[in-house]
Amino acid sequence: MSAVETSKKSEVVAQFARAANDTGSPEVQVALLTTRINELTVHFKAHTKDHHSRRGLLRMVSRRRKLLDYLKGKDADRYRALIEKLGLRK
């Protein structure tokens, strides 16, 4: 399992940051988790029996869900904008 490349990570941070040098806002954290989740999803199509990494994937999905719940309670407009931008819900 490889982490998100540094250049790709900085692109995601720049795209979802609310201010300069913003790496901790829920939007940035959710976006980074989403990129890692998408990469792992591709990995599991080829390696169906990799249960150890699947546990890590489930932890990431759970953490993303918690961050989204926090953002939804804090600011519903930001939540909806993030969901739409990432394409997470239908």
Curated annotation (Swiss-Prot):
NCBIfam families: S15_bact (TIGR00952)
Protein name: Small ribosomal subunit protein uS15
Record family assignment: Belongs to the universal ribosomal protein uS15 family.
Subunit and partners: Part of the 30S ribosomal subunit. Forms a bridge to the 50S subunit in the 70S ribosome, contacting the 23S rRNA.
GO cellular component: cytosolic small ribosomal subunit
Database matches in InterPro entries: Ribosomal_uS15, Ribosomal_uS15_bac-type, uS15_NS1_RNA-bd_sf
PROSITE patterns according to UniProt: RIBOSOMAL_S15
GO biological process: translation
PANTHER family: RIBOSOMAL PROTEIN S15, BACTERIAL AND ORGANELLAR, SMALL RIBOSOMAL SUBUNIT PROTEIN US15M
SUPFAM superfamilies: S15/NS1 RNA-binding domain
Pfam (any one): Ribosomal_S15
GO molecular function: rRNA binding; structural constituent of ribosome
Gene it is expressed from: rpsO
Native source organism of the sequence: Paraburkholderia xenovorans (strain LB400)
Functional description taken from the UniProt entry: One of the primary rRNA binding proteins, it binds directly to 16S rRNA where it helps nucleate assembly of the platform of the 30S subunit by binding and bridging several RNA helices of the 16S rRNA.
